[in-house]
Amino acid sequence: MAALPAESDTSERIKVSIADYAVAEAGTISTSGLGSCLGLAIYDPEAGVSALVHPMLPRRDGNDDRPPERFVDSGIDVVVDALLEHGASKASLRAKIAGGAAVVDFGSDDGDSIGDRNIEVAREELSDRGIELVGEEVGGDCGRTVKVDAATGDVNVSRTDGEETTL
């Protein structure tokens, strides 16, 4: 959706909305308002290119005509394809995730919240694709904002309780 040109100015800030993504080689890619949604960053440290997707639901039904970035599973596919188009190597891809909080209880019958299911699906789908999950700041009941340094893949996570973490 919001795949942006790789030739970004190093001071450029790219904002990713819910059910959207961006890919860049420089600047900062950010998203905010992460409750049960995820901020899923995938990057190639060797190529110096990163992507950030903001999915809100775990899995896409094959008949669903909503944007693939809305879902964790198909959102991963979209950003991997975009990264490969920007020179990344599939073998070098790494991932970091943030979000998945239980801020609203719309849990399933088995007791898992949407946030829990988003986290679980992200871990499964990344593993199935051979993408190493190297950092996460997930769960709990706090909202989050994520900022990705596109050149390095460093992820800064700011929580609504004032805590900050760099992944």
Curated annotation (Swiss-Prot):
<keyword id="KW-0378">Hydrolase</keyword>
<protein>
    <recommendedName>
        <fullName>Probable chemoreceptor glutamine deamidase CheD</fullName>
        <ecNumber>3.5.1.44</ecNumber>
    </recommendedName>
</protein>
<dbReference type="InterPro" id="IPR038592">
    <property type="entry name" value="CheD-like_sf"/>
</dbReference>
<dbReference type="Pfam" id="PF03975">
    <property type="entry name" value="CheD"/>
</dbReference>
<comment type="similarity">
    <text>Belongs to the CheD family.</text>
</comment>
<dbReference type="InterPro" id="IPR005659">
    <property type="entry name" value="Chemorcpt_Glu_NH3ase_CheD"/>
</dbReference>
<comment type="function">
    <text>Probably deamidates glutamine residues to glutamate on methyl-accepting chemotaxis receptors (MCPs), playing an important role in chemotaxis.</text>
</comment>
<dbReference type="InterPro" id="IPR011324">
    <property type="entry name" value="Cytotoxic_necrot_fac-like_cat"/>
</dbReference>
<dbReference type="GO" id="GO:0006935">
    <property type="term" value="P:chemotaxis"/>
</dbReference>
<dbReference type="GO" id="GO:0050568">
    <property type="term" value="F:protein-glutamine glutaminase activity"/>
</dbReference>
<keyword id="KW-0145">Chemotaxis</keyword>
